[in-house]
Amino acid sequence: GDILKKIYSKITKERRKQFQIETYIMKDGEQRLVVKRALAKDGVAHIRKMSDYYEKNKDEGILCPSKLISENEIAFEFLTGESLCNTMLEALEDKDEVRFLSLLRMYDGIIRSNVNIERRTFMPDAQFVQVFGEVSFPDEMECGKEMNIDMSFDNIIKDQTDSKYKIIDYEWVFSFPIPVKFVIYRAVSAFYTRNGSAMKDIMTINEIYDCFDITEEEIVIFENMNEAFNQYVY
């Protein structure tokens, strides 16, 4: 019989129709799966995109395995292990700045996997502008196509089964070029918003931005891009 059991569910109704999904955890015997389901016909393409991205990049071994289980549902393996975010917090708790910095360097490597990166003058194309608004940067910068912009430290988990770091969420991947630093900025600012107090006396947020050569001018532009992205989703 059908032994699939929903044990947790979260619905994003406040998004635009094509991005509205339910995320639920399902128990299939002993195995747990995280399922994302499109709430409307409009959302099927959004689900498909995640599956296509996984199929294209799965051989790198850095993405959490997933598969389409119906035309509007994608199921991800439920990975057990510690998130990069927690490991970073442990380093801060131990006041171990060296370890904290080495985790940031490792993160930098992870976000560069699966991506073709070029250094050039950034020229936003029409698709970019639709999502992130009109921007221009004074200097050449590294840009990548097929970037996953949701690479928060929470979304990277050290899989207990093989001790490899894996990305558990690839819902927001764009085919057009995006500055690599924008992805880093999003992760760092989200981390700081939630865990700023843990960083006290050890590192400031600006010191982290400095590690990645993110300038004050760039931060202002990235804030605007993020604002535009939220408008695009909601």
Show where each model-derived region lies.
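Non-catalytic membrane-proximal stalk/linker segments that position and tether the catalytic domains
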Residues: 1-28, 129-142, 219-234
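ATP-binding glycine-rich loop module of kinase domains
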Residues: 9-63, 77, 84-88
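Generic beta-strand structural signal
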Residues: 27, 68-70, 158, 179
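A generic structural signal for beta-strand entry/edge sites
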Residues: 32, 71-75, 162-164
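Hydrophobic, Leu/Ile/Phe/Ala-enriched alpha-helical segments that form helix-helix packing faces
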Residues: 50-61, 103-118, 136, 209-212
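Conserved structural core of kinase catalytic domains
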Residues: 64-133
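Helical subdomain adjoining the active site within ATP-dependent kinase catalytic cores
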Residues: 121, 125-128, 175-234
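Catalytic activation segment of kinase domains across protein kinase-like and atypical kinase folds
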Residues: 128-198
